[in-house]
């Protein structure tokens, strides 16, 4: 495996997308953050598929992939442009499980950071909804 160095300045928030009403991250982004190649990460998932029910991980459809590519310039040329297979996406639960099967220090460190970001986003959304409800009354 090639050694990949991940900067602390990476904006993980920009790697979180909404698909099927769930906040998810792409397999390619997680592979980069965890220091793996995408095919290595997906191979580990498929070997441990019983640990990844659909609310943890799922493969997106052609339509979802096209929509994702169009979403705010997501997946710019050169990054995911010529994928052989449709990407897998992972919810926060799947990301935690993924770190457990990869068992690298970097994967564990990054998964903790990612889950913290998911929680922060949920708290922000909940606070915004409460404020909106308060001001609308």
Predicted regions mapped to residue ranges:
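Basic, low-complexity intrinsically disordered segments
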Residues: 1-137
């Amino acid at each position: 495996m090639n050694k990949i160095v991940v900067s602390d300045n990476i904006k993980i928030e920009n790697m979180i997308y909404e698909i099927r009403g769930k906040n998810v991250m792409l397999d390619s982004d997680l592979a980069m953050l965890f220091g793996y190649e995408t095919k290595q990460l997906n191979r580990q998932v498929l070997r441990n598929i019983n640990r990844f029910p659909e609310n943890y991980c799922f493969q997106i459809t052609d339509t979802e992939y096209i929509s994702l590519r169009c979403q705010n310039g997501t997946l710019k040329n050169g990054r995911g442009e010529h994928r052989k297979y449709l990407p897998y996406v992972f919810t926060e639960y799947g990301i935690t499980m993924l770190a457990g099967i990869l068992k690298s220090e970097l994967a564990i460190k990054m998964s903790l950071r990612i889950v913290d970001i998911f929680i922060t986003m949920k708290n922000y959304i909940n606070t915004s909804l409460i404020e909106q409800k308060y001001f609308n009354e």
